[in-house]
């Protein structure tokens, strides 16, 4: 499914060129992963949907990353906790995402739920990472989880994303290791999702 060569799409700096590569190389892989992920997600009694990023508002600059989001809502995902599989120029990531679009209406409710799952987050493998913005390629140790919740509560453009990132060149790119790792991450994050949904 995914290959180390997928990162080469980011070498094309033009909007049209990169978008064509995203549509022809990456989006089909997102759809293929969705065919694996959706049956697993649908076992919880909810119907889940895959939302592949279209980048329709882009008119000048090529996107620095692209993604597919999984949510139990056919019309959208940003206003709900959801899962997100994406690719940057140097890594593929899979996150349980609570994005800024839930603010301000749901801030108090979701931050309380995020605090309640802190023990579950601490049980995740040490290799799991935390991001505070799905549009910035920077991650943190899970030890900063509580700080990230406080930041989410007080900073307008902040998010809480928990999951895995697989760096370009990682040995997992050989064989099926990457898909297995992404599916395992989803299964490990599902109990947390169930508590914050």
From Swiss-Prot:
<dbReference type="InterPro" id="IPR009403">
    <property type="entry name" value="UPF0637"/>
</dbReference>
<dbReference type="Pfam" id="PF06335">
    <property type="entry name" value="DUF1054"/>
</dbReference>
<comment type="similarity">
    <text>Belongs to the UPF0637 family.</text>
</comment>
<dbReference type="InterPro" id="IPR053707">
    <property type="entry name" value="UPF0637_domain_sf"/>
</dbReference>
<protein>
    <recommendedName>
        <fullName>UPF0637 protein LEUM_0496</fullName>
    </recommendedName>
</protein>
